[in-house]
């Protein structure tokens, strides 16, 4: 009788926990940021700074900087990538921002996200650029930081053959 009661309590606890987790951990869907796609910042001597990060922090560098490969949480069979890149301090790529950095956010539903932002009075800095490994557009946040939004195509990005940090 004690074993039967214990088994019943364990089953009840399992199903209550499972049911609660299903009700409370719904995946976030819709147009949104899903993660960090890249961290970009200016440097006086990008080549020397890349060499320093490689030598002392063990970061493998490619043409644009370091790529970090990871597996996506909702489907661990899918790869994702985050880029760490240096730009010359004279770059115009971060304009109209005057900041020394720019963050690239990975997004889902870029077109709808842009429509939602436009409805809120937020206009993109440029038009959507589509390339094989995704779509990009830039916006400004209220404090003058330029933000890059990237709807990635990670399958195509992986084919670019970068020496990824894993």
Where are these regions (language model features)?
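Mid-chain, structured segments of secreted extracytoplasmic proteins
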Residues: 75-101
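Vicinal oxygen chelate
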Residues: 2-3, 15-44, 63-64, 91-166
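Residue-level signal for short segments within beta-strands and strand-turn junctions
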Residues: 72, 88, 151-153
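Core segments of cupin and vicinal oxygen chelate
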Residues: 30-34, 40-85, 119, 135-137
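Residues that cap or initiate secondary-structure elements
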Residues: 47, 74, 109-111, 155
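Bacterial N-terminal signal peptides
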Residues: 7-15
